[in-house]
């Protein structure tokens, strides 16, 4: 997670960025690292709250230890690792009304445009963004986003992994 943070650390304004949104961030390990560097910020998480019995972990093929989609475990994990309860806002994608405030930073690594097509979120992201909002996510089609955002910058390449992609930072929706 530290290496993930380092791919975008230089783009975070340590004084101005207060409100962070994580879409599909699992337990929130990345946000804990951000919190170590930027304490007392507000973190919002949009997750699904179910554990799939179809996903199997472990070499034997029999162990199912999936926990990253259990929102109670996520909240406990964040608190045990130093995030204050007042900093944590978790939303169940399937049941809750999603947050409608403006965010300074929106992060969705290997989720938005990876598991879920970007188009599913485009209107929602427009609604919760302002001119300075930074949206950071992984994609295999960075050029596609040139027609959606004024600013699109490739900030990291992930070419030596199974999930070959480019991490991009986007801001300022067009139209």
Kindly label every feature range from the protein language model.
Residues 93-106:
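A short acidic, Gly/Pro-enriched loop at the edge of an enzyme's catalytic core
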Residues 16-26, 44-47:
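Conserved class I S-adenosyl-L-methionine
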Residues 61-96:
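S-adenosyl-L-methionine
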Residues 132-142:
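Conserved beta-strand signature within the Rossmann-like core of class I S-adenosyl-L-methionine
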Residues 1-18, 33:
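Conserved alpha-helix/loop element of class I SAM-dependent methyltransferases that forms part
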Residues 27-40, 56-57:
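Conserved SAM-binding loop of SAM-dependent methyltransferases across substrates and taxa
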Residues 104-117:
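A short SAM/SAH-binding and catalytic strip from SAM-dependent methyltransferases
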Residues 119-132:
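A short glycine-rich, Lys/Arg-flanked "PGG" loop and its adjoining helix->strand segment in the class I
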């Amino acid at each position: 997670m530290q290496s993930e943070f380092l791919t975008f650390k230089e783009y975070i304004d340590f004084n101005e960025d207060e409100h962070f949104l994580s879409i599909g961030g699992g337990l929130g390990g990345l946000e804990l690292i951000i919190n170590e560097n930027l304490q007392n910020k507000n973190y919002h998480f949009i997750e699904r709250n179910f554990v799939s019995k179809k996903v199997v972990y472990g070499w034997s093929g029999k162990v199912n230890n999936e926990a990253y989609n259990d929102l109670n475990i996520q909240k406990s994990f964040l608190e045990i690792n130093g995030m204050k309860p007042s900093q944590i806002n978790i939303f169940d994608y399937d049941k809750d009304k999603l947050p409608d405030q403006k965010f300074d930073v929106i992060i969705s690594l290997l989720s938005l445009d990876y598991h879920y097509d970007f188009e599913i979120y485009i209107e929602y992201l427009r609604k919760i963004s302002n001119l300075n909002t930074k949206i950071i996510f992984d994609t295999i089609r960075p050029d596609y986003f040139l027609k959606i955002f004024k600013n699109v910058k490739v900030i990291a390449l992930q070419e030596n992994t199974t999930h070959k992609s480019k991490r991009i930072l986007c801001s300022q929706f067009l139209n």
